[in-house]
């Protein structure tokens, strides 16, 4: 497993989570919008109070701006955010089943010359470090990012890759879903847009939580 300061996976996969109900709108717009441009009809799965704080966080490098000017991705599936959804800790009161993982890579974004930054931990904490060159991916704690048990490394596991203003749909390489029923629903929505890029839709059960093995304060389950 890559270690902090030594190596990082190439391609460096990035994962955006969204609700199934948002997929049609994403396809109609041809991509993902940042929170500041989010349509009021979009199904929100986030913490409201954290989003209010993120709206004020300044990005000090690269294209700058604020966090809400960027489309957020994690460097791993099965994130702490998904656990919060799974255990109904966010403003969204559904479960993880309709949550999709939209997968791309940091290299694809860079090759498309789309402005981006990334962080070494959760982007909204005070002591976060921001970067805007891929060579600095080695500064991230990849052992924490890839950890199955992350109660003690929660902030570093939530390192973010942030794409400025708009993320084009054609850069999505895969859609990961929890089961075949959701897979069929995603395929049905994609079929309504025959002229658009159709990434493979794959059942990735290991990207989702199976059951709670501990209290919400532990937040580390298989």
From Swiss-Prot:
The entry's stated outcome for residue 68 to A is: Still toxic in E.coli, decreased ADP-ribosylation
Identify the stretch(es) annotated as NAD(+)-binding element: 38-56
Mutagenesis / variant outcome for changing residue 78 to A = Still toxic in E.coli, decreased DNA ADP-ribosylation activity
Show the GO MF annotations: DNA binding; glycosyltransferase activity; nucleotidyltransferase activity
Keywords, A to Z, come to:
DNA-binding, Glycosyltransferase, Nucleotidyltransferase, Toxin-antitoxin system, Transferase
What's its EC?
2.4.2.-
**What is the recorded phenotype of mutating residue 47 to A?**
Still toxic in E.coli, decreased DNA ADP-ribosylation activity
The record's InterPro entries line, in alphabetical order, gives: DarT (IPR029494)
Question: What would be one Pfam family of this protein?
Answer: DarT
Can you state which reaction this protein catalyses? a thymidine in DNA + NAD(+) = an N-(ADP-alpha-D-ribosyl)-thymidine in DNA + nicotinamide + H(+)
**Entry note about domains:** The NAD(+)-binding element stabilizes the ADP-ribosylating turn-turn (ARTT) loop which confers substrate specificity; both domains contribute to ssDNA-binding.
Record's function text: Toxic component of the hybrid type II/IV toxin-antitoxin (TA) system DarTG, which plays a crucial role in controlling bacterial growth and bacteriophage infection. Its toxic effect is neutralized by cognate antitoxin DarG. In case of phage infection, DarT toxin ADP-ribosylates DNA, which inhibits both viral DNA and RNA synthesis and leads to abortive infection. ADP-ribosylates ssDNA on the second thymidine of the consensus sequence 5'-TNTC-3'; the protein does not auto-modify. Has no activity on dsDNA in vitro. This leads to a decrease in DNA replication.
**What quaternary structure, including any partners, is listed in this protein's UniProt entry?**
Interacts with cognate antitoxin DarG (via C-terminus); this heterodimeric complex neutralizes the toxic effect of DarT by preventing ssDNA binding to DarT and consequently inactivating the toxin by direct protein-protein interactions.
Name this protein carries in UniProt: DNA ADP-ribosyl transferase
- Organism this protein belongs to: Thermus aquaticus (strain ATCC BAA-2747 / Y51MC23)
């Amino acid at each position: 497993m890559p270690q902090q300061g030594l190596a990082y996976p190439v391609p460096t996969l990035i994962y955006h989570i969204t609700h199934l109900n948002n997929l049609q709108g994403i396809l109609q717009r041809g991509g993902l919008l940042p929170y500041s441009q989010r349509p009021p009809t979009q199904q929100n799965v986030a913490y409201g109070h954290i989003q209010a704080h993120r709206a004020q966080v300044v990005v000090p490098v690269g294209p700058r701006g604020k966090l809400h000017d960027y489309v957020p991705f994690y460097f791993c599936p099965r994130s702490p955010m998904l656990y919060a959804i799974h255990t109904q800790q966010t403003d969204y009161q559904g479960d993880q089943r309709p949550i999709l993982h939209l997968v791309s890579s940091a290299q694809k974004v860079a090759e498309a010359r789309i402005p981006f930054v990334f962080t070494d931990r959760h982007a909204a904490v005070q002591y976060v470090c921001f970067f805007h060159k891929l060579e600095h991916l080695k500064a991230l704690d990849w052992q924490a990012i890839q950890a199955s048990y992350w109660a003690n490394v929660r902030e570093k596991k939530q390192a973010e890759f942030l794409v400025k203003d708009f993320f084009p749909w054609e850069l999505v390489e895969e859609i990961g879903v929890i089961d075949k029923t959701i897979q069929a629903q995603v395929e049905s929505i994609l079929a309504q847009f025959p002229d658009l890029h159709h990434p493979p839709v794959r059942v990735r059960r290991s990207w989702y939580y199976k059951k709670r093995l501990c209290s919400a304060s532990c937040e580390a389950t298989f």
